[in-house]
Amino acid sequence: MPYIFAFFCTGFLGAVVGANFPNNIQIGGLFPNQQSQEHAAFRFALSQLTEPPKLLPQIDIVNISDSFEMTYRFCSQFSKGVYAIFGFYERRTVNMLTSFCGALHVCFITPSFPVDTSNQFVLQLRPELQEALISIIDHYKWQTFVYIYDADRGLSVLQRVLDTAAEKNWQVTAVNILTTTEEGYRMLFQDLEKKKERLVVVDCESERLNAILGQIVKLEKNGIGYHYILANLGFMDIDLNKFKESGANVTGFQLVNYTDTIPARIMQQWRTSDARDHTRVDWKRPKYTSALTYDGVKVMAEAFQSLRRQRIDISRRGNAGDCLANPAVPWGQGIDIQRALQQVRFEGLTGNVQFNEKGRRTNYTLHVIEMKHDGIRKIGYWNEDDKFVPAATDAQAGGDNSSVQNRTYIVTTILEDPYVMLKKNANQFEGNDRYEGYCVELAAEIAKHVGYSYRLEIVSDGKYGARDPDTKAWNGMVGELVYGRADVAVAPLTITLVREEVIDFSKPFMSLGISIMIKKPQKSKPGVFSFLDPLAYEIWMCIVFAYIGVSVVLFLVSRFSPYEWHSEEFEEGRDQTTSDQSNEFGIFNSLWFSLGAFMQQGCDISPRSLSGRIVGGVWWFFTLIIISSYTANLAAFLTVERMVSPIESAEDLAKQTEIAYGTLEAGSTKEFFRRSKIAVFEKMWTYMKSAEPSVFVRTTEEGMIRVRKSKGKYAYLLESTMNEYIEQRKPCDTMKVGGNLDSKGYGIATPKGSALRGPVNLAVLKLSEQGVLDKLKSKWWYDKGECGSKDSGSKDKTSALSLSNVAGVFYILIGGLGLAMLVALIEFCYKSRSESKRMKGFCLIPQQSINEAIRTSTLPRNSGAGASGGSGSGENGRVVSQDFPKSMQSIPCMSHSSGMPLGATGL
């Protein structure tokens, strides 16, 4: 029962909602002219609708450039309860319309020029033209051209073209002709003629475009050599007969393809319709704006039909509202209509009609039309995915190799080590046999795989290929291909965008990048105290402080702990009732114990108390880890001679000024830094272009010589392959540091559309997969190198230590021995002076006593004495005699009073 009840409730609510959906939908219309073709197309489209709901128009004729009148008409229609408004705008009124639509949630469907807005309630029927226009300019390889535009339709297309021009280094002259008079047109084209500007883009609406083209014909700027690109979607709407007769080249875009099935059917219905409000209009070929108007009506019809099927209530019961209210009250159902409009998709007069989340056309196709002296033809199409796709030609490159084998091809190249070099005895050979090198063998391998005969020819000007900025002519090997003087270029020719526009490249046969060449630094010899290098100086300082700290703590612990004190054994004759306590860990013994433990040699005394043993244990653990770590690193530091390079990367170069750096004066490396937007490379370019003296060199050889003679004060930036090759050439004093700054490749070039492109490309891929390319590079870079392998000889140098590696240890040994002898002398002198002062009289010390003093300080005790007896205890715990030396106890002395010799008891 609950399910049945819910089912009936749902059905009842759906019926109520469906009943509330209006059968008649009021829609607004704002048109600039009642007799316009767009107005008639609007009426015709409404007459073709058969499914409910019925769309009832509220049409106003308005001056679309007058903001006040547009505001009044817009608010008037909104107050009448329209659900959506169809209309046109201009630059002066577009901001007002988008503002009202966003505030009131009223949808505005327009075929006017697209605007860059985030307002989702403005549905733009006209596709955007920016990307398609840029693709066509790229297709024709324009570098310098004039851009004529009408500011009334906005500046979005111009802004996109200027941004691209900055990226691709185009030279664009923008001219606004909004207020240009007939005299102004004459002066404009005279000025362009003086500057030899014959490539022109015209960005205007159809009415103004026809006027401009009329002026061009009147001024006779439509002859052979002129090329105009019309940034307009109605190429077939424009009268170009005068251009066809005079020989100018005109290219444009066509949105409506009248030969397609749907446009042809609709056009037939349009012509045969007997609707009274559009019989006075010529329907032979409607303008593209009229086609957009027709599709706009269908968009609204599809959206409201979808809302009706979904039973969404959009009725405006008492919700007409006031668009001038402050604050503005948005229409609650406006968002539902906006979503329904954006979800519409169908095939219309203008092709696929579909919108993105911003209300702009997407997934559309533009037909590219070209008119020459021989007539009008479609040269391709443009869409968002494929960009510009040229029309198919009869000849397909690479389809048949039979013609390739019937002639001898010219292979242009350049003398550059190790790619192409003259043999030492070249005069004894003829033809291709005079040359050797990487590219010579590569050309032979490719010819073998493709199956053609060839002849190597060195390019006459010795250049790779660049376009002259004044004459626009190509030089070098690229020029040889462009102007048909060569068929293939096999050389270290970098694949770049500007070259790819005029010639075809194969897949890269070698990858490379910009690298840094410096003079190879001398290997750093180990210092006298290199044995200290395994640990940082901070660690050594911490070890010293730890040693002192442990010794002091051990001394204090031994003094405080009662278990560290012990009684001395008594000598004969002493009072045994007196207890004499001793402690072996004085401050000097504590230092000695810590030093012995650190040196892992041990000591003849050890702590007796638990606290003292804890101190000793943690110190032993500490020294175990430190000594083990030191030993592990010692071998590497003593046996390896390092080359300390002052530069390791481009960042190191950029942040210093002591070492100069530069590139080839004219080449792709210099262009890379000039065009780079990366902060580090921009900083490097700023330095290079302002450095005095100049850091640029004319040839790679000059850069190499400058590096070798600069004593490490100059770094040369060049392609990594050449850097690696020079590193293997005598005198072996240069080296490559750091990684590559960019990534590019060398390719084999052929003229545009050459039948060799496909076979050559396949040959390069096959050689790469077979490892032939790697073998060739290894042969000409390393096998024929003059400096040996990078790691050769390193094992012999690291197997034995030289005296310089351990000289510091010997210095410390000698210094320690000398210090010990000096301290012994000081001890002897100090003790002798102390003993002599203690005597109360003038004593004559015989030579025998001196000898005994030098011999030892520990003398045999009396037989009655204990093992450790005596009246005093030394620092190390041994018992010593109070009198030094002991033989002095029997030294005869002269009394001051009697002058008689006295015994020891007389002292």
From Swiss-Prot:
<dbReference type="GO" id="GO:0098978">
    <property type="term" value="C:glutamatergic synapse"/>
</dbReference>
<dbReference type="GO" id="GO:0060291">
    <property type="term" value="P:long-term synaptic potentiation"/>
</dbReference>
<dbReference type="GO" id="GO:0008328">
    <property type="term" value="C:ionotropic glutamate receptor complex"/>
</dbReference>
<dbReference type="GO" id="GO:2000463">
    <property type="term" value="P:positive regulation of excitatory postsynaptic potential"/>
</dbReference>
<dbReference type="GO" id="GO:0060292">
    <property type="term" value="P:long-term synaptic depression"/>
</dbReference>
<feature type="compositionally biased region" description="Gly residues">
    <location>
        <begin position="866"/>
        <end position="875"/>
    </location>
</feature>
<feature type="intramembrane region" description="Helical; Pore-forming">
    <location>
        <begin position="585"/>
        <end position="600"/>
    </location>
</feature>
<dbReference type="GO" id="GO:0005886">
    <property type="term" value="C:plasma membrane"/>
</dbReference>
<dbReference type="GO" id="GO:0090326">
    <property type="term" value="P:positive regulation of locomotion involved in locomotory behavior"/>
</dbReference>
<dbReference type="GO" id="GO:0034765">
    <property type="term" value="P:regulation of monoatomic ion transmembrane transport"/>
</dbReference>
<dbReference type="InterPro" id="IPR019594">
    <property type="entry name" value="Glu/Gly-bd"/>
</dbReference>
<keyword id="KW-0472">Membrane</keyword>
<keyword id="KW-0732">Signal</keyword>
<keyword id="KW-0967">Endosome</keyword>
<dbReference type="GO" id="GO:0043278">
    <property type="term" value="P:response to morphine"/>
</dbReference>
<dbReference type="GO" id="GO:0032591">
    <property type="term" value="C:dendritic spine membrane"/>
</dbReference>
<keyword id="KW-0597">Phosphoprotein</keyword>
<comment type="similarity">
    <text>Belongs to the glutamate-gated ion channel (TC 1.A.10.1) family. GRIA1 subfamily.</text>
</comment>
<dbReference type="GO" id="GO:0035254">
    <property type="term" value="F:glutamate receptor binding"/>
</dbReference>
<dbReference type="GO" id="GO:0098839">
    <property type="term" value="C:postsynaptic density membrane"/>
</dbReference>
<dbReference type="GO" id="GO:0007268">
    <property type="term" value="P:chemical synaptic transmission"/>
</dbReference>
<dbReference type="GO" id="GO:0016020">
    <property type="term" value="C:membrane"/>
</dbReference>
<keyword id="KW-0406">Ion transport</keyword>
<dbReference type="GO" id="GO:0010226">
    <property type="term" value="P:response to lithium ion"/>
</dbReference>
<dbReference type="GO" id="GO:0022849">
    <property type="term" value="F:glutamate-gated calcium ion channel activity"/>
</dbReference>
<dbReference type="GO" id="GO:0005789">
    <property type="term" value="C:endoplasmic reticulum membrane"/>
</dbReference>
<dbReference type="GO" id="GO:0008021">
    <property type="term" value="C:synaptic vesicle"/>
</dbReference>
<keyword id="KW-1003">Cell membrane</keyword>
<feature type="short sequence motif" description="PDZ-binding">
    <location>
        <begin position="904"/>
        <end position="907"/>
    </location>
</feature>
<keyword id="KW-1071">Ligand-gated ion channel</keyword>
<keyword id="KW-1015">Disulfide bond</keyword>
<dbReference type="GO" id="GO:0060076">
    <property type="term" value="C:excitatory synapse"/>
</dbReference>
<dbReference type="GO" id="GO:0098794">
    <property type="term" value="C:postsynapse"/>
</dbReference>
<dbReference type="GO" id="GO:0055038">
    <property type="term" value="C:recycling endosome membrane"/>
</dbReference>
<feature type="modified residue" description="Phosphoserine">
    <location>
        <position position="849"/>
    </location>
</feature>
<keyword id="KW-0407">Ion channel</keyword>
<dbReference type="GO" id="GO:0099544">
    <property type="term" value="C:perisynaptic space"/>
</dbReference>
<dbReference type="GO" id="GO:0019865">
    <property type="term" value="F:immunoglobulin binding"/>
</dbReference>
<dbReference type="GO" id="GO:1990635">
    <property type="term" value="C:proximal dendrite"/>
</dbReference>
<dbReference type="GO" id="GO:0032281">
    <property type="term" value="C:AMPA glutamate receptor complex"/>
</dbReference>
<keyword id="KW-0256">Endoplasmic reticulum</keyword>
<dbReference type="GO" id="GO:0098793">
    <property type="term" value="C:presynapse"/>
</dbReference>
